[in-house]
């Protein structure tokens, strides 16, 4: 956003889904913005910057609550750009349309990552943009290839964002397996849910609303004494991850924008407690049983571990 000349701002998350909270987005638009009748869009009261786009992140394999966000987009005249990098194949039931919609198909545009660790991963760096806007598609094609409209003719300053043929070939083959792999991830998640049943006070499990079909890019639990649990799992030979250890608005890259601790309390609290357990389609029942047993054993030793 900032590299494109805009000013980023952040909306807090829903405590259960970890995706953008539409109610907080509305609060931002109604409380921190005024209507700019000349531009026909909301503008920040203090900075004067217009709200031209909102980027909901489909996190951990689950889509954001798109209907509510799109309703606000229609009301306040901004574009919705989906960050679908972790949600290849995820679905959302749109009450507005009375049908299931895929991640990347609802906004004005969407970004996908094919980093090797994603549900659909290349063998190196790769990504894609989807849109129904032909003019935007042409702009993306131009920018990705050093701004060339044809070879050696540069219309604008662009960059090298080309997807090479080898990566595209791998992705084309793997795409045919994506639905099966996503279904296997759902089965792995369901087994975890059953293994941790009864321990929800110590291990808060991923929440999947009825309007969501997650593809479980990550299986993220929430615990109290995370560092100690992670250490004990590591000692048991079980790898874990933290996605993510710091809220983006508090990173050094954005310190010049004046964001402070407490601006996004839900996201900040989650960052201190979330822990990603092993998740991939081939994870076996016996492996999951061992992981769950080690987690529960560690939490029995650790007091005050509730989320």
Regions found by a protein language model. Give the residues of each.
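Substrate-binding/gating loop at the entrance of the active-site cleft, primarily
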Residues: 1-23, 117
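Conserved G/P- and acidic residue-centered "switch" motifs that form tight phosphate/ATP-binding loops
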Residues: 5, 83, 133
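Short, glycine/acidic-enriched loop or turn micro-motifs at the edges of active sites
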Residues: 15, 61, 85-86, 281
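PLP-dependent aminotransferase class I/II
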Residues: 23, 35-49, 53-56, 62, ...
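Short, Asp-centered acidic motifs that coordinate Mg2+ and/or phosphate
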Residues: 52-53, 79, 109
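Conserved active-site segment immediately N-terminal to the catalytic lysine
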Residues: 82-121, 150-155
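Adenylate-forming
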Residues: 111, 122-126, 169-171
């Amino acid at each position: 956003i900032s590299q494109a000349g805009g000013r980023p701002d952040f909306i807090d998350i829903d405590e259960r889904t970890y995706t953008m909270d539409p109610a907080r987005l509305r609060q931002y638009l109604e409380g921190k913005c005024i209507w700019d009748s000349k531009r026909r869009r909301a503008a920040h009261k203090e900075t004067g910057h217009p709200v031209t786009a909102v980027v909901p992140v489909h996190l951990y394999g689950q889509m954001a609550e798109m209907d509510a966000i799109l309703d606000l987009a229609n009301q306040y005249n901004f574009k919705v750009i989906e960050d679908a990098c972790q949600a290849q194949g995820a679905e959302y039931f749109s009450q507005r349309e009375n049908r299931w919609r895929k991640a990347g198909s609802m906004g004005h545009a969407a970004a996908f990552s094919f980093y090797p660790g994603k549900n659909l991963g290349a063998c190196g760096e790769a990504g894609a943009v989807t849109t129904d806007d032909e003019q935007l598609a042409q702009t993306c094609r131009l920018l990705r290839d050093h701004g060339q409209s044809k070879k050696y003719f540069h219309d604008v300053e662009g960059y090298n964002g080309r997807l090479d043929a080898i990566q595209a070939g791998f992705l084309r083959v793997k795409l045919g397996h994506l639905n099966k792999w996503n279904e296997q991830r759902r089965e792995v998640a369901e087994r975890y849910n059953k293994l941790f049943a009864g321990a929800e006070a110590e291990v808060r499990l991923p929440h999947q609303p009825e309007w969501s079909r997650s593809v479980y890019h990550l299986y993220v639990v929430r615990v109290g004494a995370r560092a100690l649990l992670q250490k004990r799992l590591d000692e048991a030979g079980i790898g874990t991850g933290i996605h993510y250890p710091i809220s983006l608005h508090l990173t050094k890259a954005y310190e010049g924008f004046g964001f402070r601790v407490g601006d996004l309390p839900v996201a900040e609290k989650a960052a201190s407690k979330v822990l990603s357990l092993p998740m991939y389609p081939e994870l076996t029942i016996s492996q999951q049983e061992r992981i769950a047993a080690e987690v529960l054993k560690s939490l029995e030793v650790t007091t005050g571990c509730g989320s």
